[in-house]
């Protein structure tokens, strides 16, 4: 049950008679890769692990224990606990080498601050605990260097550059409302690169279109946490095309140079872009958030282009059977013009987005 599962990382045969291998096989037959979501640093009080090793959890002796989300944090300063947590991941990957992705979650802060292992060295707990986590992650990375892992911690609570040595991406926030995400992703990108920022299309804020939600997520590492049954035929087609476009352009988006053009904190719109290092390809994102009545719409001035090159402008990520109303669409401009004069891409529509591809000719 949910009250006693954390810590006991064993397959429930009554629920999964074929175990994880059957899930991996089923996913493969459906044409997708299989990923798994784990929270190996935590333990529930009614788990077999806690009953066998109560001294493996961080908790105060002779005090009433406070349970956050009915869980405790394992004491990663303890080498035996490090071995256990490594073993959780190692066993899964050893038995299921085709597992293609790990989401590593951490949903509780450290409470009941006391390490049974450190005894009279309690002042070292926070430091030794974090070092223990990184020791585990290094062992995993050394043995399984090609398995991508996402770090999630109640959202983005544990994002740091040391973690980037071991994780391929961060879950920026549990808030996936696309309007809020514009602000979150704008701020997050001040510190971390786009390729480290997970951004998923979800059901939050259904007042916004699937296109808008997808265009917001596609400015980072695009993903979907959305049931296909929630989408109509046109929306499914749109998502398929948007994923194809993102996949085609992801080298520019994830590895190109990022330019923040219009901040959402300064008004009712947002825009940023990515340009390839050779300046031959760029992707421009524009978002209308909550335009005011009669608001003057200013052109978006691009950056990072070659002033002497000519660029073909093309709006992509369009809904089926719709046409672009972008005045610059399918036209060619010099990089100098695009950076000094710009493109009239903003509109007076609420929660409206454009994705624009620029190609040097």
Question: Across the structure, where does each feature detected by a protein language model lie?
Answer:
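Active-site groove signature of glycoside hydrolases
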Residues: 84-118
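Carbohydrate-binding surface patches
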Residues: 263-307
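Conserved, mostly hydrophobic/aromatic
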Residues: 27, 85, 149, 217, ...
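Aromatic-lined carbohydrate-binding/catalytic grooves of carbohydrate-active enzymes
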Residues: 1-87, 96, 101
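Catalytic cores of secreted or luminal carbohydrate-active enzymes
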Residues: 211-262
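C-terminal beta-sandwich/jelly-roll accessory domains of carbohydrate-active enzymes
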Residues: 290-361
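Glycan-recognition surfaces
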Residues: 44-45, 49-83, 127-230
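Active-site-proximal loop/turn and secondary-structure-junction residues that shape catalytic pockets
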Residues: 38-44, 106-110, 153-157
């Amino acid at each position: 049950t949910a009250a006693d599962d954390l810590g006991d990382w064993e397959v429930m045969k009554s629920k999964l008679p074929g175990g994880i291998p059957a899930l991996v096989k089923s996913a493969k037959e459906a044409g997708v890769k299989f990923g798994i979501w784990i929270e190996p640093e935590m333990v529930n009080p009614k788990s077999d692990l806690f009953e066998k090793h109560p001294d493996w959890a961080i908790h105060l002796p002779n005090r009433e224990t406070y349970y956050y989300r009915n869980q405790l944090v394992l004491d990663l300063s303890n080498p035996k606990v490090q071995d256990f947590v490594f073993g959780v991941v190692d066993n899964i990957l050893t038995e299921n080498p085709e597992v293609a992705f790990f989401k590593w979650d951490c949903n509780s802060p450290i409470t009941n601050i006391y390490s049974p292992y450190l005894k009279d060295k309690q002042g070292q707990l926070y430091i030794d605990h974090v070092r223990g986590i990184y020791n585990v992650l290094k062992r995993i990375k050394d043995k399984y260097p090609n398995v991508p892992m996402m770090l999630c911690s109640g959202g983005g609570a544990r994002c740091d550059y040391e973690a980037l040595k071991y994780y391929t991406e961060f879950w920026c926030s549990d808030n996936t409302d696309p309007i809020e995400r514009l602000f979150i992703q704008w701020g997050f990108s001040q510190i971390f690169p786009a390729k480290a920022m997970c951004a998923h299309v979800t059901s939050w804020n259904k007042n916004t279109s699937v296109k808008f939600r997808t265009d917001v997520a596609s400015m980072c590492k695009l993903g979907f946490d959305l049931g296909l049954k929630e989408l109509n035929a046109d929306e499914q087609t749109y998502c398929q095309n948007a994923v194809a476009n993102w996949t085609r352009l992801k080298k520019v988006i994830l590895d190109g140079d990022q330019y923040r053009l219009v901040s959402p904190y300064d008004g009712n719109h947002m825009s940023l872009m990515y340009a390839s290092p050779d300046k031959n390809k760029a992707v421009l994102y524009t978002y209308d958030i909550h335009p005011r009545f009669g608001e003057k719409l200013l052109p978006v001035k691009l950056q990072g282009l070659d002033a002497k090159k000519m660029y073909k402008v093309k709006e992509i990520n369009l809904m089926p059977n719709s046409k672009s109303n972008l005045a610059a669409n399918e036209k060619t401009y010099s990089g100098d013009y695009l950076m000094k004069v710009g493109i009239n891409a903003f509109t007076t529509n609420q929660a409206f987005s454009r994705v624009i591809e620029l190609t040097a000719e």
